[in-house]
Design a protein with these regions (language model features):
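Short, hydrophobic/aromatic-rich segments at coil-to-beta transitions
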Residues: 63, 94-95, 133-136, 177-183, ...
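Alpha-helical transmembrane signal-anchor/signal-peptide segments
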Residues: 25-44
């Protein structure tokens, strides 16, 4: 009996040692992959640098903690006190992330400086067969401020969340395309510039014709492939309301063979035209929101075709091809 216990103990010890060695090797790979982001050019791919990078979570997780994080993408420079990403060893396709605020955002081209603060900010993404099964990000007590000269609050909300869901019935293995449904919600939003307070907003979207492998997202031919697959952005619903105003919109947009947007967006509103008067003067306000009806509500349809945005048949803006 004693000999069996010794053998069992030896086996357990060997497993622990082997697993510890494997974890150390894998943690080194994780560290190396994150460190490689510091060598990106910040143009074709974002550059991430960490003041301090630590990998923890032994034995069943990999927790990557990046303090004093700095992200460069084009003209935008983003700085955060800390970022954390975690993956369970037995569920490597499920990533959890969180961030410490506030986040400083600088545009090196325009010189603008903004800050986004929060009390909690967390995200998760789960993959299934390299498709996004679900992705979410949620923030609490968000405050967006202009910090170029002092600090001026632009907008704030106690809760904002974004969710993406796979639409399994629209997955086409033959054409290698997938579809995502998106849901964005913000509650009790305050935007002093538009005299908005206690505003609730919801956005529901569906995007079809996406590559069914996220590793192919961002490829140079992604948009042409989406167009060839008859991909479409369905604006299922945009709904915003506060004590005196409502705004609703829906429609669909796609790409034509030249990479130009085509489709329609229908907008109905009450109390919005008066609210955005200082930002959108006539005749543009009427061209976007439409003329008031007998009940005081506004309705209009924006058409997208041949590289133009039209209010009815009147061109109001131009959009270049997307590919």
């Amino acid at each position: 009996m004693k000999k069996r216990i010794i053998i069992l103990g030896g086996v357990v010890l060997a497993v622990v040692v082997l697993w510890s060695a494997a974890w150390l090797v894998l943690s080194g790979v994780v560290r190396q992959q994150i460190a490689l982001q510091a060598e990106a050019d910040g143009l074709t791919s974002p550059q991430l640098t960490c003041g301090t990078l630590t990998i923890g979570g032994f034995p069943f997780r990999f927790d990557a903690d990046c303090s004093s994080a700095r992200i460069v993408s084009g003209d935008a420079v983003i700085e955060l006190p800390g970022l954390r990403a975690s993956v369970l060893v037995y569920a490597p396709t499920h990533l959890l992330a969180s961030a410490l605020g506030p986040m400083q955002v600088t545009d090196t081209f325009t010189g603008s400086r903004n800050q986004l603060a929060w009390s909690a900010l967390a995200a998760s993404i789960r993959l299934a067969d390299w498709r996004i099964a679900r992705a979410s990000i949620s923030g609490e007590n968000l405050v967006w401020s202009d910090t170029l000269l002092g600090s001026s609050t632009i907008a704030q909300t106690p809760l904002a969340e974004l969710h993406l869901f796979d639409i399994p019935e629209q997955h086409d293995p033959t054409r290698q395309t997938a579809a995502l449904a998106g849901y964005l919600r913000s509650s009790e939003l305050a935007y002093p510039g538009l005299t908005l307070s206690d505003t609730n907003a919801e956005l529901q979207l569906e995007l079809t014709g996406l590559p069914d492998d996220v590793r192919n997202w961002g490829a140079p031919d992604m948009l042409p492939a989406l167009q060839a697959a008859n991909g479409q952005l369905n604006v299922v619903s945009i709904h915003g309301t506060d004590a005196t105003s409502t705004l609703d919109a829906s429609g669909a947009l796609a790409l034509d063979a030249q990479g130009q947007l085509e489709g329609q967006i229908t907008i109905t509103s009450t109390g919005v035209a008066e609210r955005i008067g200082p930002l959108l003067e006539e005749p543009w306000r009427t061209l976007v929101l439409g003329a008031p009806g007998p009940d005081g509500s506004f309705a209009n349809q924006l058409n997208f075709r041949d590289g133009a945005i039209l209010s009815g048949l009147v061109p109001i803006a131009a959009i270049g091809p997307l590919f």
